A protein has these predicted regions:
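Mature catalytic core of soluble alpha/beta enzymes
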Residues: 1-177
Length: 177
């Protein structure tokens, strides 16, 4: 039986709260990862934070085990959040249903967009916009991101059974090794 879960931006908000606390202690270089990510500064090697974007394979429940691409976080504080339908879904009568509900229809979304990774000024906003993109679908998300210079995004979608990637101009995704 499907269950409703209302925590769409809770993890992003929690990252921001932890980051605020770390700032209050004088920490300048950080990566807060509690399901969603907030990062600022550099990693312990003095380089930009590097993140793997998970390949949206059904059942890929081990973050980092199957990587679609590598992303270097931009300078300054940012929230970096991925929403997708490859970990949270259900199957009924042989048909897969996403956990994302389109509020315009009241039904689970049905489109080719598999995951949306968003970079915003904080993790709360990134979380909200990643969820929003998962409701919009590929084409509407592309238009939305193109209209928002304050956001960067990477969309992974299914094109005839093959994973394809679309990234906004400022989101550089390198191939995973």
């Amino acid at each position: 039986m499907p269950k409703l879960n209302y925590n769409a931006i809770a993890q992003g908000y929690s990252c921001d709260l932890v980051a605020e606390y770390l700032y209050s202690l004088g920490v300048k270089d950080m990566m807060v990862d509690i399901g969603e990510i907030f990062c600022d500064g550099v990693n312990p090697s003095g380089r930009p934070w590097t993140l793997g974007i998970d390949r949206p394979e059904d059942g890929n429940n081990d973050p980092g085990s199957q990587i679609q691409g590598i992303f270097k976080a931009p300078e300054g504080p940012h929230g970096i959040v991925t929403s997708g339908n490859y970990r949270k879904f259900y199957v009924r009568d042989g048909k897969k249903y996403s956990h994302s509900i389109d509020p315009r229809t009241g039904y689970p979304v049905q489109h080719s967009l598999l995951s949306a990774t968003i970079v915003a000024e904080n993790a709360t906003l990134a979380d909200a916009y990643a969820t929003y993109c998962m409701v919009l679908g590929l084409e509407e998300s592309q238009r939305f991101l193109a209209s928002r210079p304050d956001l960067e995004g990477c969309l992974v979608y299914d094109e005839d059974g093959v994973f394809q990637t679309w990234c906004s101009d400022g989101f550089v995704l390198e191939e995973a090794e």
